[in-house]
């Protein structure tokens, strides 16, 4: 009988450890970076819809998404160079917690006016600008962000 109780207690402890270990990852946000470096409006639209689908699937509280834009990808933020629906999609995604990483190298090299880059009706903020889009992608991947290229 004593052996039975010892084995039962050991199994109880083992199952609790397994349960604790399985639940350790709960509450941890999935980290994802979406990469935009094309001026193709269809790619912009598809990528922005992918981000919304991602949020819908896992819940905005369970995911941290950063959209990094560089090179021709900055056309997403320029009136007259992108579809109006994409402006609205980006604004809606920002309201859900999606962050932007807008490449300062591109802004500088293309002599863009930061005040002409916008998200919906709002201008981009200094906090949306990163020194280099490609450097930001590498940094985020080294921090465990999953990489998605629409």
Question: What name fits each language-model region?
Answer:
Residues 21-150:
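Secreted/extracellular ectodomain signature
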């Amino acid at each position: 009988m004593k052996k039975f109780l010892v084995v039962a207690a050991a199994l109880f402890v083992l199952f609790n450890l397994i349960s604790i270990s399985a639940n350790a990852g709960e509450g941890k946000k999935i980290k994802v970076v979406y990469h935009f470096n094309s001026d193709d409006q269809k790619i912009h639209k598809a990528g922005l819809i992918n981000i919304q689908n991602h949020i819908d699937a896992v819940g905005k509280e369970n995911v941290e998404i950063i959209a990094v834009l560089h090179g021709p990808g900055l056309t997403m933020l320029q009136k007259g160079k992108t579809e109006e629906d994409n402006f609205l999609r980006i604004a809606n995604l920002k309201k859900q917690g999606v962050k932007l990483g807008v490449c300062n190298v591109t802004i500088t090299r293309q002599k863009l006016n930061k005040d002409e880059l916008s998200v919906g009706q709002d201008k981009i903020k200094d906090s949306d600008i990163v020194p280099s889009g490609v450097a930001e992608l590498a940094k985020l991947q080294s921090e465990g962000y999953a990489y998605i290229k629409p």
